[in-house]
Protein backbone atom coordinates (compact mmCIF):
# COMPACT_ATOMS: atom_id res chain seq x y z
CA UNK A 1 0.00 0.00 0.00
CA UNK A 2 1.04 3.57 -0.65
CA UNK A 3 0.93 4.95 2.89
CA UNK A 4 2.19 1.83 4.62
CA UNK A 5 5.13 2.09 7.02
CA UNK A 6 7.82 -0.60 7.34
CA UNK A 7 6.80 -3.30 9.81
CA UNK A 8 8.80 -5.83 11.80
CA UNK A 9 7.10 -8.91 13.24
CA UNK A 10 6.84 -9.01 17.01
CA UNK A 11 8.57 -12.39 17.19
CA UNK A 12 11.64 -10.98 15.44
CA UNK A 13 11.74 -7.69 17.36
CA UNK A 14 11.25 -8.86 20.96
CA UNK A 15 13.75 -11.07 22.75
CA UNK A 16 12.25 -14.35 23.90
CA UNK A 17 8.77 -13.61 22.52
CA UNK A 18 8.45 -16.79 20.45
CA UNK A 19 9.69 -19.04 23.29
CA UNK A 20 7.71 -17.32 26.06
CA UNK A 21 5.00 -19.42 27.70
CA UNK A 22 3.48 -16.23 29.15
CA UNK A 23 3.23 -14.58 25.70
CA UNK A 24 1.34 -17.55 24.28
CA UNK A 25 -1.38 -17.23 26.93
CA UNK A 26 -1.61 -13.41 26.92
CA UNK A 27 -4.02 -11.02 25.26
CA UNK A 28 -4.31 -7.23 25.44
CA UNK A 29 -0.56 -7.03 26.00
CA UNK A 30 0.33 -4.18 23.64
CA UNK A 31 1.97 -2.14 26.42
CA UNK A 32 4.09 -5.14 27.44
CA UNK A 33 5.21 -5.70 23.83
CA UNK A 34 5.89 -1.98 23.30
CA UNK A 35 7.86 -1.86 26.56
CA UNK A 36 9.92 -4.93 25.62
CA UNK A 37 10.76 -3.67 22.13
CA UNK A 38 11.44 -0.07 23.26
CA UNK A 39 13.82 -0.99 26.07
CA UNK A 40 15.39 -4.05 24.37
CA UNK A 41 14.38 -6.40 27.19
CA UNK A 42 12.82 -9.86 27.03
CA UNK A 43 9.06 -10.29 26.88
CA UNK A 44 8.99 -12.08 30.25
CA UNK A 45 10.99 -9.28 31.94
CA UNK A 46 8.69 -6.63 30.43
CA UNK A 47 5.61 -8.60 31.48
CA UNK A 48 6.78 -8.77 35.10
CA UNK A 49 7.93 -5.11 35.13
CA UNK A 50 4.65 -3.79 33.71
CA UNK A 51 2.66 -5.99 36.13
CA UNK A 52 4.68 -4.79 39.14
CA UNK A 53 5.16 -1.11 38.27
CA UNK A 54 2.07 -0.33 36.16
CA UNK A 55 -0.37 -2.60 38.02
CA UNK A 56 -1.27 -4.68 34.96
CA UNK A 57 -3.46 -7.74 35.53
CA UNK A 58 -3.00 -10.83 33.29
CA UNK A 59 -5.06 -10.66 30.07
CA UNK A 60 -6.71 -7.40 31.21
CA UNK A 61 -4.67 -4.70 29.52
CA UNK A 62 -2.72 -1.83 31.08
CA UNK A 63 -4.36 1.36 32.32
CA UNK A 64 -2.67 4.63 33.29
CA UNK A 65 0.31 4.01 31.01
CA UNK A 66 0.92 7.70 30.24
CA UNK A 67 0.99 8.70 33.92
CA UNK A 68 3.35 5.83 34.77
CA UNK A 69 5.75 6.70 31.93
CA UNK A 70 5.71 10.40 32.88
CA UNK A 71 6.42 9.39 36.49
CA UNK A 72 9.34 7.20 35.35
CA UNK A 73 10.70 10.16 33.37
CA UNK A 74 10.30 12.60 36.29
CA UNK A 75 12.04 10.20 38.69
CA UNK A 76 14.82 9.49 36.16
CA UNK A 77 14.12 5.75 36.31
CA UNK A 78 16.14 3.77 33.78
CA UNK A 79 15.31 0.34 32.42
CA UNK A 80 18.13 -1.63 30.80
CA UNK A 81 20.26 1.55 30.96
CA UNK A 82 17.72 3.55 28.93
CA UNK A 83 15.75 6.58 30.05
CA UNK A 84 12.38 7.97 28.97
CA UNK A 85 11.95 11.44 27.47
CA UNK A 86 8.36 12.68 26.93
CA UNK A 87 7.78 14.44 23.61
CA UNK A 88 5.49 17.39 23.03
CA UNK A 89 3.93 19.96 25.30
CA UNK A 90 3.23 18.90 28.85
CA UNK A 91 -0.17 19.80 30.30
CA UNK A 92 0.22 19.61 34.09
CA UNK A 93 0.91 15.95 34.95
CA UNK A 94 -0.40 14.37 31.78
CA UNK A 95 0.80 14.21 28.19
CA UNK A 96 -2.39 13.39 26.26
CA UNK A 97 -2.77 15.31 23.02
CA UNK A 98 0.68 16.79 23.55
CA UNK A 99 1.82 16.35 19.95
CA UNK A 100 0.11 19.22 18.16
CA UNK A 101 1.51 21.15 15.23
CA UNK A 102 0.48 24.25 13.28
CA UNK A 103 -1.08 23.99 9.82
CA UNK A 104 -2.03 26.99 7.70
CA UNK A 105 -5.20 26.43 5.67
CA UNK A 106 -6.46 29.31 3.49
CA UNK A 107 -4.40 31.79 5.49
CA UNK A 108 -5.68 30.59 8.86
CA UNK A 109 -3.29 28.80 11.21
CA UNK A 110 -4.80 25.90 13.12
CA UNK A 111 -3.51 23.31 15.56
CA UNK A 112 -3.72 19.69 14.42
CA UNK A 113 -3.12 16.41 16.21
CA UNK A 114 -0.07 14.63 14.89
CA UNK A 115 -0.75 11.38 13.06
CA UNK A 116 1.47 8.31 13.08
CA UNK A 117 2.56 9.02 9.48
CA UNK A 118 3.49 12.64 10.25
CA UNK A 119 5.36 11.56 13.37
CA UNK A 120 7.49 9.06 11.44
CA UNK A 121 8.31 11.71 8.79
CA UNK A 122 9.42 14.17 11.49
CA UNK A 123 11.26 11.52 13.56
CA UNK A 124 12.96 9.10 11.13
CA UNK A 125 15.63 8.01 13.65
CA UNK A 126 15.29 6.93 17.26
CA UNK A 127 13.20 4.63 19.42
CA UNK A 128 9.73 5.81 20.40
CA UNK A 129 7.05 4.37 22.69
CA UNK A 130 3.87 5.51 20.93
CA UNK A 131 0.36 5.67 22.38
CA UNK A 132 -2.77 6.02 20.29
CA UNK A 133 -6.35 5.63 21.52
CA UNK A 134 -6.54 2.33 23.40
CA UNK A 135 -3.25 0.97 22.05
CA UNK A 136 0.55 1.19 22.31
CA UNK A 137 3.39 0.22 19.98
CA UNK A 138 7.02 1.00 19.20
CA UNK A 139 8.59 2.88 16.31
CA UNK A 140 12.32 2.15 15.92
CA UNK A 141 14.15 4.09 13.20
CA UNK A 142 10.91 4.40 11.22
CA UNK A 143 10.00 0.70 11.58
CA UNK A 144 6.76 -0.17 13.38
CA UNK A 145 6.87 -2.94 15.99
CA UNK A 146 3.43 -3.97 17.22
CA UNK A 147 0.36 -5.21 15.38
CA UNK A 148 0.48 -5.37 11.55
CA UNK A 149 -2.31 -2.77 11.25
CA UNK A 150 -0.19 -0.24 13.19
CA UNK A 151 1.95 0.11 10.05
CA UNK A 152 -1.06 0.63 7.75
CA UNK A 153 -3.09 3.10 9.84
CA UNK A 154 -0.83 6.11 9.21
CA UNK A 155 -3.68 8.63 9.62
CA UNK A 156 -4.35 7.50 13.19
CA UNK A 157 -4.05 10.46 15.61
CA UNK A 158 -1.44 10.03 18.31
CA UNK A 159 -2.19 10.59 21.99
CA UNK A 160 1.45 10.94 23.05
CA UNK A 161 4.95 9.59 22.50
CA UNK A 162 8.06 9.00 24.56
CA UNK A 163 11.59 8.79 23.21
CA UNK A 164 13.69 6.00 24.69
CA UNK A 165 17.40 6.91 24.83
What would you call each of these model-derived segments?
Residues 16, 33, 96-97, 151-154:
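A generic signature of intrinsically disordered, low-complexity regions enriched in glycine/proline
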Residues 143-165:
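Noncatalytic regulatory segments and standalone regulatory/sensor domains
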Residues 54-134, 140-142, 147-149:
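Conserved active-site-adjacent core of cysteine acyl-enzyme catalytic domains
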Residues 1-82, 91:
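Active-site nucleophile-adjacent alpha helix/oxyanion-hole segment immediately C-terminal to the catalytic cysteine
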Amino acid sequence: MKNELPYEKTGNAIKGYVESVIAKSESRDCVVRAFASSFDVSYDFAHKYVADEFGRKPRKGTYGTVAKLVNMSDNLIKVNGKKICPLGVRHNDYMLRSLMYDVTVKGVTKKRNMTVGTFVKQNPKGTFFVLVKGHAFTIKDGIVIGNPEDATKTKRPMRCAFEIK
